[in-house]
Swiss-Prot record:
The keyword Metal-binding does not apply. The lineage of its organism: Bacteria, Pseudomonadati, Pseudomonadota, Alphaproteobacteria, Hyphomicrobiales. Disulfide bonds: none annotated. It is found in: Cell membrane. This is Putative ionic transporter y4hA. GO terms for cellular component: plasma membrane. It comes from Sinorhizobium fredii (strain NBRC 101917 / NGR234). NCBIfam families: caca2. Keywords: Cell membrane, Ion transport, Membrane, Plasmid, Transmembrane, Transmembrane helix, Transport. It is a multi-pass membrane protein. Possible cation transporter. The chain crosses the membrane at residues 12-32, 39-59, 74-94, 108-128, 143-163, 172-192, 221-241, 249-269, 291-311, 318-338, 347-367.
């Protein structure tokens, strides 16, 4: 069976480079004040281009991921998505909008809840409906959950209980240490996933099949160049839309956390679709790699970067979760440990995760 990341065409789809290129041009002209910044039509067009650029970047990352194989391919996709996430968060933090000290926390928390409850819930429900019971490598899930639980607790829970900084915030030295610990721990996990215990993270069918190949050697080179173009488009469009997004949420009277949920939802949409497709093909191990990899990268990469921005520029960075979100995180990690603790899943576990995700969305809009 071909890998789920198999590239079936030697031709680069037109949309995958036209949208990022057009997005770069529109964003650059607007930021240079050639086009009107407050135009509603332009902002709506930019939002559509941002979504398209996210899909394009993940598409090109998938081409590269197919060349390197699993589990490295899942890592590449997760890092690509996290770069986009960091770019959007950084743009909002530097925009000067009210509440921007909380956007990193809200986005990272939303990303964890979306992938661990929304995406994994859909994977288990749809995959279980088609294949009844699905299996995956228990060692892989255990290793990832151990790191994820530690990083989430240190980054999102501990700030509520330290006394050296402001409420829900680390002091500068604490923030530096937590950032370094996150980078090191995530780096060790990547070493285990790609070198020391690589076999833990490989699907049985992937191990038995030869690596995916492309019809032309030009594909990876073109994909690499277009991936850079797509990421640049995302960064420029994020800078353009950062202030209007904050203003829209405020005008609608919604909590600031909705900004984080929106960012995480847009960024994770393509990868979520890929994960669900893998589950439908009875490749649950690939889905688990993508889901847990995204959650780990979201904390292990995003937190150190925003911590560096905060310390370097002297900006406040609130990371501690509100009480209701703290309960939701603990519940998610607890249920996730049970769900992924046997190596086999059914529709029931997926339904539980979707129920938690529904409550998370409710609390995001109505705390």
């Amino acid at each position: 069976m071909k890998s789920r990341l198999q590239v079936r065409s030697a031709h680069v789809p037109l949309w995958s480079w036209i949208i990022p290129l057009f997005g770069c041009v529109i964003a650059a002209m607007t930021l240079a004040h050639v086009l009107p910044e407050r135009s509603v039509v332009l902002l709506l067009m930019s939002a559509g281009l941002l979504t398209g650029a996210v899909f394009a970047s993940v598409h090109h990352a998938e081409i590269l991921a197919a060349r390197v194989g699993q589990p490295s391919g899942a890592i590449l996709l997760a890092v690509c998505v996290t770069i986009i996430e960091v770019a959007i968060i950084g743009s909002l933090m530097l925009s000067g909008a009210e509440g921007n000290e909380e956007v990193a926390r809200d986005t990272v928390f939303a990303a964890v809840m979306i992938v661990l409850n929304g995406v994994i819930g859909l994977c288990l429900v749809l995959g279980g409906r088609r294949h009844r019971e699905q299996s995956f490598q228990l060692n892989a899930a255990s290793a990832a959950l151990a790191v994820l639980g530690t990083l989430a607790t240190l980054s999102l829970v501990l700030p509520n209980f330290v006394t050296a900084g402001k409420p829900q915030q680390f002091a500068a030295i604490q923030l530096v240490v937590i950032g370094l610990v996150s980078v090191v721990l995530y780096g060790v996990f990547l070493f285990v996933q790609t070198v020391r215990h690589r076999d833990y993270f490989i699907d049985d069918e992937d191990a038995a099949s030869p690596p995916a190949t492309h019809e032309t050697p030009r594909n990876p080179l073109a994909a690499g160049a277009l991936l850079v173009l797509a990421l640049i488009a995302v960064i420029l469009l994020a800078m353009l839309l950062s202030y209007p997004l904050d203003s829209a949420v405020e005008a609608l009277g919604l909590p600031q956390a909705v900004v984080g949920v929106t960012i995480a939802g847009v960024v994770l949409l393509p990868e979520g679709i890929t994960s669900v497709k893998a589950a439908l093909m009875n490749r649950l191990q690939n889905s688990i790699n993508l889901v847990l990899g995204s959650a780990l990268a979201s904390i292990g990469v995003t937190i150190p970067v925003v911590a560096a921005i905060s310390v370097a520029l002297g900006r406040d960075l609130a990371l501690g979760l509100a009480p209701q979100n703290l309960i939701m995180l603990i519940l998610t990690l607890f249920v996730g440990t049970i769900t992924l603790g046997t190596g086999r899943t059914t529709v029931l576990q997926g339904a539980v995760h979707l129920a938690i995700f529904t409550v998370f969305l409710l609390l995001s809009a109505i705390p």
